[in-house]
């Protein structure tokens, strides 16, 4: 069975959630250049794969630190994640973590990898009560972002993770969202409400 899917039970018991690994799909292409620097910071590079748009159910993938990322395409999106992380309520963090070297000096940010299942998977497996709970958190987060004129731009259910540690995580904000995408965010949320029976 592929990672990220639910294990269905043949009995009347509800399906057991199977953990999958998801990452923000912002990872750096300059792997050979970054690997020595990451090793210096004590990061396990055997678990870090440098590729853009790694398949969703791949093994754990780490992203590069923003100050070392040279790609003109990746830096704006990384900055967007950091910007949104500062605005979203602490109970609904975006997956950004500070990184320090062995001396404790701040180095930059790295995007963590997350274990959990997507909102898409919850809906597909008819776990609608949990899907509604996750969606309520997303709505609260998006309202706060929109109040600050910040738009996510891609609120599809595959970009919402119900993490195994209890968090709800938003993935993959568009790097250059247009103001009119606020309406797009709202329409996507309305569609998700219908899918989970929240209306």
Question: Which residues does each predicted region cover?
Answer:
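Protein kinase-like catalytic core scaffold
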Residues: 48, 91, 109, 169-172
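Catalytic-loop of the protein kinase fold
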Residues: 146-163
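Conserved structural core of kinase catalytic domains
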Residues: 92-134
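C-lobe/activation-segment region of protein kinase-like
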Residues: 163-199
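Regulatory N- and C-terminal appendages and interdomain linkers associated
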Residues: 1-15, 23
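Conserved alphaE helix
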Residues: 130-144
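ATP-binding glycine-rich loop module of kinase domains
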Residues: 18-89, 93
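Short, glycine/acidic-enriched loop or turn micro-motifs at the edges of active sites
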Residues: 115, 157, 175
């Amino acid at each position: 069975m592929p990672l990220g899917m639910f294990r269905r039970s043949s009995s009347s018991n509800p399906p057991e959630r199977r953990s999958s690994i998801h990452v923000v799909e912002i990872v750096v292409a300059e792997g050979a250049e970054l690997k020595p620097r990451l090793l210096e910071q004590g990061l396990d590079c055997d678990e870090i794969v440098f590729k853009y748009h790694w398949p969703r159910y791949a093994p754990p993938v780490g992203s590069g630190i923003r100050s070392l990322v040279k790609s003109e395409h990746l830096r704006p999106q990384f900055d967007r994640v950091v910007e949104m992380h500062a605005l979203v309520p602490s109970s609904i963090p975006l997956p950004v973590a500070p990184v320090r070297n062995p001396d404790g000096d701040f180095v930059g940010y790295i995007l963590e990898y997350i274990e959990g299942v997507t909102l898409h998977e919850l809906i597909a497996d008819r776990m609608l009560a949990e899907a509604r709970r996750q969606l309520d958190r997303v709505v609260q987060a998006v309202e706060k972002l929109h109040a600050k004129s910040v738009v996510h731009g891609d609120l599809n259910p595959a970009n919402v993770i119900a993490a195994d540690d209890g968090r709800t995580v938003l993935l993959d904000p568009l790097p250059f969202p247009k103001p009119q995408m606020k309406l797009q965010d709202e329409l996507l949320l309305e569609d998700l409400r219908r899918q989970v029976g929240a209306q």
